[in-house]
């Protein structure tokens, strides 16, 4: 869908970089990031001594882990002036606590950047979405990776975005029309703090979560699905690892050559049969029919698109059309497992 603004325009308009993480317990933060990277197949030793590019690091909190792995070169491509200041302050403070490689901040947009030398590892987390421009940028991003290098990006399903889509729609009844960003954030923090505090391991600051998830127009670009990613970057890449781990490949390893490899096809088949599990991490259900899952995902996309269109048009009334779209998704979820009938029914 077409949004009035993207992430960057919104950030620049308000001079914000609302992606800060709580790193007061730095050891815990680094362990969390290390667990993620190890799970996707990139342990610390695979980063050490490598040339790394990270696109859209925001305030830089997540970059601390990569820096602590001592890459040979660490470039941060970030066009947001507010983020530059926060990155510099973050590294100034934390380099006193642990050994860090000082990153090079490249103060450009991805659209204006060209890499004269390719990187071993390219990272772009939770930024590029599904609109035409951002899918083209994904293609550009992939060209910065050396042959047999690693590209780390955020992929996902609209099903995984559903809880935040519902929270976003509910926020329409909380904030007043034409309120300032500051007033809207204060109202949302007041409304959602008790709820957010039930998420034990949430690390994003509540203020930034409200600015980014409940108010930022870039929310509606979502993340590309794995199928979109493969379509955009072609067969130059295969999905090497993911978190959560999606596929279990029981084929005989000696058969994995030439046209038999089909790593992406095996991953996509497993992914489509498991996307219902993105809705609620409290339940891990058995794989189910791919077509039923894709129908559920389409309903989730429909709801997200409707909410985004309403906001673009200035119509944030939770009326029959919105409720009907929500119920269409809920009905499909309740069919999957009766556990969801109580909170969703």
Q: Where are the language model's segments positioned?
A:
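Conserved alpha-helix/loop element of class I SAM-dependent methyltransferases that forms part
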Residues: 26-49
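Conserved SAM-binding loop of SAM-dependent methyltransferases across substrates and taxa
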Residues: 59-71
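Rossmann-like AdoMet/SAM-dependent catalytic core
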Residues: 204-345
């Amino acid at each position: 869908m077409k949004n009035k603004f993207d992430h960057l325009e919104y950030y620049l308009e308000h001079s914000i970089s609302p992606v800060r993480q709580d790193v007061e317990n730095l050891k815990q933060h680094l362990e969390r990031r290390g667990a993620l990277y190890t799970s996707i197949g990139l342990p610390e030793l695979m980063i050490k001594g490598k040339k790394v590019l990270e696109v859209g690091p925001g305030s830089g909190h997540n970059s601390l882990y990569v820096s602590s792995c001592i890459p040979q070169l660490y470039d941060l491509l970030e066009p947001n002036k507010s983020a530059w200041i926060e990155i510099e302050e973050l590294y100034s403070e934390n380099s006193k606590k642990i050994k860090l490689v000082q990153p090079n901040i490249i103060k450009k947009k991805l659209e204006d950047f060209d890499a004269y030398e390719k990187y071993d590892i390219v990272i772009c987390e939770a930024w590029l979405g599904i609109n035409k421009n951002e899918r083209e940028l994904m293609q550009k991003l992939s060209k910065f990776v050396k042959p047999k290098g690693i590209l780390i990006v955020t992929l996902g399903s609209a099903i995984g975005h559903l809880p935040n889509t519902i929270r976003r729609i509910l926020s329409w009844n909380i904030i007043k029309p034409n309120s300032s960003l500051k007033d809207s954030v204060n109202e949302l923090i007041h409304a959602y703090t008790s709820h957010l505090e039930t998420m034990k391991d949430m690390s994003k600051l509540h203020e930034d979560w409200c600015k980014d998830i409940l108010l930022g127009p870039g929310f509606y670009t979502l993340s590309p699905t794995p199928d979109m990613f493969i379509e955009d970057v072609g067969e130059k890449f295969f999905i090497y690892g993911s978190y959560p781990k999606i596929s279990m490949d029981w084929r005989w390893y000696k058969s994995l050559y030439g046209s038999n490899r089909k790593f992406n096809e095996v991953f996509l088949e497993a992914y489509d049969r498991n996307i219902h599990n993105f809705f609620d991490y409290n339940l891990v259900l058995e794989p189910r029919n791919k077509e039923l899952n894709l129908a559920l995902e389409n309903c989730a996309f429909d709801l997200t698109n409707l909410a985004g269109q309403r906001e673009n048009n200035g119509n944030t009334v939770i009326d029959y059309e919105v409720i009907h779209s929500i119920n269409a998704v809920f009905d499909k979820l309740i069919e999957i497992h009766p556990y969801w009938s109580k909170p969703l029914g």
